[in-house]
From Swiss-Prot:
Residues 523-526 are annotated as: G4. Residues 60-76, 95-118, 297-312 have a biased composition (Basic and acidic residues). Residues 559-561 are annotated as: G5. Keywords: Cytoplasm, GTP-binding, Initiation factor, Nucleotide-binding, Protein biosynthesis. Residues 414-587 form the tr-type G domain. Residues 41-59 have a biased composition (Polar residues). One of the essential components for the initiation of protein synthesis. Protects formylmethionyl-tRNA from spontaneous hydrolysis and promotes its binding to the 30S ribosomal subunits. Also involved in the hydrolysis of GTP during the formation of the 70S ribosomal complex. It comes from Leptospira biflexa serovar Patoc (strain Patoc 1 / ATCC 23582 / Paris). It is found in: Cytoplasm. This is Translation initiation factor IF-2. Residues 1-312 are annotated as: Disordered.
Length: 917
């Protein structure tokens, strides 16, 4: 009865609005099947230490009666109707628009509970459901099973009245103004409000249970917050993963270090503003300070965070590096195109790699390089293969391809054939062309030998034919190869009296490589020694079977000198061209090939261009090899000025900024700007390909080779010729003369007249200057005499090769040849003091001279025991120069006395013979 009276007084005090008294304790009746009692969240958070002591020793029946009395008394007095009365027995209010939904009941066997309600109410911290830490009051709400928590009470069916200002319920993830309700993830303003906010800060006041993951301001509030800081107060159980401020509260928090409780009472009292709080629970008095240790926990957390960040940073950097490497490898193309030589920076760009990575790779391969060094194609292939990339070696012009135009099919017309005349030297190629043109071309050639390619267009009864006349000398291999590459038909001229020769075979190979048909012209059939059948037999061994023998090759017996069979040859050419049916579009920009180029004293750089497609006109901008220009004037093969040149027309073009290489492509472009851009790119690639600083592997073998090469004898020359093709031919012929003992080094090769710069270069490098079909002016000749530079002029390539060869042979060390001149037998040995042993000899064969070299051969072993010179030779008592066969003589050797009777002395001479290349 005393307990009932105490409770009654408590309820009356709460109804009268006394804020400083103890909180109302409301217990919910447990289900009959439950073995344990559970208090509501509000009651747990607001149970004082005195009430916990009063309720802990009571029996189960007594508690049941007490709870019923509390509920009946609360209903009778109508709590919540007054301005200061608490709103509900439970902080979770019912809602009128929804039916109550009971919480699911978990299986008790799966979640056993070894504590008793008494231990909760009494603040027993020895229970395994609590962590260590001081304080009394309610336990940690996060540790209770769902079935032990206060279930949601039924909600009234009547409509819910609007909330007045100051009484608003808790918001969700927002800021909560001053009032009573519990907010969720928001800041809770000061007031008496209901349950604690979730993940938000709770302002000072007397409110309900603690917030979740938020800070709780000072006050007397309910249970501790979750993952947040709790302000000073008397509140309930400790927070979860957060720091608990000073207060009297319940058991310690979770996952936090809880230090010793500070001395003294809790923080300030309630800061509740005036007004109704129907949804809030009454606040309590400030209690003793809560557990400390927050700073230590934060320090440990921050320290661990720093260590984790350092490790994470290391692994992230490694991961990023591996990812970058994988991305770099993925960016490497499957195939790249390069020239014979390529810069390190350029190949790195083609491989989509950083130059530093490529340099590092090359250094591992034993090559000391920088970004500007040049490596050869072989090294580049090995480097690219390590990255899974294939290398394709291309020419200079493949690297700078000019975009092709699209031709309309209706614009195509049949173009005249391009015929190249090939064969061995002096087999009558130029004479044949002379007969066809009815001109005197052959007489204009030096020595009757063609020195460069001639391009002509001939008008016949059956149509036009473009002819290219190539040199037959072995030095002009490159010219013949170019002629075969731009031609449609090859006419192979073979002399009937001479048969197949080396250049004949070479011409056959060039034509087969170019995949062009061959028509054989058997020339000089009017000579008595002519044997056309022998020529057919020899050519059949090289795959050229005559049609009359069942083959596919056309043979024409002709005589260029007597004009025999020429018409038949032209007819065969036209028939073959009709079968090939080559087309071209005269409406497009011109495209062709440089047949020949030279530096003309009056017109500058000029080039013979064979137009293969399109039409070339005066004023067109073009790119010729590595040079650019604009057509200033054009001339035909007879020297007449023309305005345009169509397909299969050879034209002489002026307006180039340099002398292009023979065989270089000729392309008309849009304007001068594009021409210069392409020209500069090609010149850069050309310099790169000719670079002398190509990196090499650093090995002892290379060093030995360099040392050996330094001892080589070397002849240095500078070559100047009238046309580029002749320059190439002379250079190629001379470079073939190099041997292991003497080497020919072409310092410079160019076209045009010999100028002062050539003389200065020759003087500095100790070279001779060779002029082929070109000369030096008087001023340059005077400079050469002053600098003591030799200039040689030639018009026939035979003379160039023979004289240079003789000069190189003179640089060779002569070959020493041993010649035995006599043999002498030793028949006696005379010992003379102060002189030595003298051999008494008989000359058995030849003769022995005082100047001869001799060797002593032992009669016992047959081995040579000594070699040297004769010091003195005597016949009787007289000194003699030589002794012939059958005569006796005395021989004193220079420095040798250990010979015996029966030994043989062999006399020989050493002659020096000039070596040949």
């Amino acid at each position: 009865m005393e307990e009932q009276k105490s409770i009654k007084e408590t309820l009356q005090q709460g109804a009268s609005g006394d804020k400083t008294k103890k909180k109302l304790v409301i217990k919910k009746k447990a289900a009959p099947s439950d073995e344990k009692k559970e208090s509501s969240p509000g009651a747990q958070g607001q149970t004082t230490a005195t009430e916990a002591k009063q309720s802990s020793p009571a029996s189960s029946d007594k508690k049941k009666d007490l709870n019923e009395l509390i509920r009946e008394e609360a209903k009778r007095q109508g709590l919540g109707s007054g301005p200061q009365a608490p709103s509900q027995a439970s902080p979770i209010v019912s809602r009128p628009d929804r039916k109550p939904e009971p919480l699911p009941q978990p299986d008790r066997e799966k979640a056993p509970m070894d504590r008793k309600p008494e231990s909760i109410l009494s603040g027993d911290t020895s229970s395994p459901n609590f962590r260590s830490g001081g304080g009394q009051g309610g336990g940690n709400q996060g540790y209770f099973r769902k079935e032990d928590r206060n279930p949601i009470v039924s909600r009234p069916t009547t409509p819910r009245p609007p909330r007045p200002e100051g009484q608003t319920g808790g918001g969700y993830q927002g800021n909560r103004g001053p009032g009573q309700g519990g907010g969720y993830q928001g800041n809770r303003g000061p007031g008496q409000g209901g349950p604690g906010g979730y993940q938000g800060n709770r302002g000072p006041g007397q409110g309900g249970p603690g917030g979740y993951q938020g800070n709780r301001g000072p006050g007397q509030g309910g249970p501790g917050g979750y993952q947040g800081n709790r302000g000073p107060g008397q509140g309930g159980p400790g927070g979860y993963q957060g720091n608990r401020g000073p207060g009297q509260g319940g058991p310690g928090g979770y996952q936090g270090n809880r230090g010793a409780r500070p001395i003294g009472q809790g923080g300030p009292g309630s800061g509740r503003p005036p007004g109704d709080a129907p949804f809030g629970a009454p606040g309590g008095l400030p209690g003793a300070g809560g557990p400390g240790g927050a700073k230590k926990r934060v320090f440990d957390k921050e320290k661990g965070g720093r260590e984790e960040n350092e490790n994470t940073k290391f692994f992230k950097q490694s991961f990023r590096k591996q990812k970058a490497q994988a991305a770099a490898l993925a960016a490497v193309p499957k195939e790249i195109s390069i020239l014979e030589n390529i810069q390190v920076g350029e190949i790195a760009k083609k491989l989509n790699l950083k130059p530093g990575e490529v340099i590092s790779k090359l250094m591992k391969m034993g090559m000391m390089v920088t970004i500007n060094n040049v490596i050869d194609a072989e090294t580049a292939s090995i480097l690219a293969d390590d990255y899974g990339c294939k290398v394709k070696i291309v020419s200079l012009y493949d690297e700078t391809v000019i975009e092709e135009e699209k031709d309309a099919p209706e614009d195509y017309i049949t173009r005249p054939p391009v015929v190249t005349i090939m064969g061995h030297v002096d087999h009558g190629k130029t004479k044949l062309l002379d007969t066809i043109r009815s001109s005197r071309v052959a007489e204009g050639e030096s020595g009757g030998i063609t020195q460069h390619i001639g391009a002509y267009q001939v008008e016949t009864e059956r149509g036009k034919i473009a002819f290219l006349d190539t040199p037959g000398h072995e030095a002009f291999t490159s010219m013949r190869a170019r002629g075969a590459s731009v031609t449609d038909i090859v006419v192979l001229v073979v002399a009937a009296d001479d048969g197949v020769m080396p250049q004949t075979i070479e011409a056959i190979n060039h034509a087969k490589e170019a995949e062009v048909p061959i028509i054989v012209a058997v020339n000089k059939i009017d000579l008595p020694a002519a044997n056309p059948e022998k020529v057919r037999q020899e050519l059949s061994n090289y795959g050229l079977q005559p049609e009359e023998w069942g083959g596919t090759t056309i043979f024409c017996d002709i005589s260029a000198k007597s004009n025999i069979g020429i018409d038949k040859l032209l007819e065969m050419l036209i028939i073959q061209a009709e079968l090939l049916d080559h087309k071209a579009n005269p409406k497009r920009k011109a495209k062709g090939t440089i047949v020949e180029a030279k530096l003309d004293p009056g017109r500058g750089a000029v080039a013979t261009v064979l137009i293969q497609n399109g039409t070339l006109r005066v004023g067109d901008a073009f790119v010729a090899g590595v040079h650019a220009g604009r057509v200033r004037a054009m001339y035909d093969d007879l020297g007449r000025s023309i305005k345009e040149a169509g397909p299969s027309f050879p034209a002489l073009v002026t307006g180039l900024d340099g002398v292009p290489d023979a065989g270089a492509p000729f392309d008309v472009v849009i304007d001068d700007k594009e021409a210069r851009t392409i020209s500069h790119s090609r010149q850069e690639y050309e310099r790169l390909g000719q670079s002398k600083n190509a990196a090499t592997r650093v090995t002892l073998d290379n060093m030995s080779e360099i040392i050996k090469q330094g001892a080589l004898k070397e002849l240095k020359v500078i070559i100047k010729a009238d046309v580029r093709g002749s320059t190439e031919a002379v250079k190629e012929a001379l470079e073939k003369l190099s041997t292991a003992d003497v080497r020919l080094n072409v310092i410079h090769a160019g076209t045009g007249a010999i100028v002062d710069s050539d003389i200065i270069l020759a003087s500095a490098s100790n070279a001779i200057v060779i002029g082929f079909h070109t000369r030096a002016n008087p001023k340059t000749v005077s400079l050469a005499e002053k600098e003591k530079v030799e200039i040689k002029y030639y018009s026939i390539i035979y003379d160039v090769v023979n004289e240079v060869k003789a000069s190189m042979e003179g640089m060779l060390e002569p070959e020493k040849v041993e010649n035995i001149i006599g043999k002498v037998e030793i028949r006696d040995v005379f010992k003379i003091s102060k002189v030595g042993n003298i051999a008494g000899c008989m000359v058995k064969s030849g003769k022995v001279t005082k100047q001869a070299h001799v060797r002593v051969i032992s009669s016992e072993t047959g081995e040579i025991t000594w070699e040297g010179k004769i010091k003195n030779l005597k016949r009787m008592k007289d000194d003699v120069a030589d002794v012939l066969t059958g005569f006796e003589c005395g021989i004193l050797l220079d420095g040798f006395n250990d010979f015996s009777v029966g030994d043989e002395i062999e006399a020989y001479e050493i002659r020096e013979i000039a070596r040949k290349l």
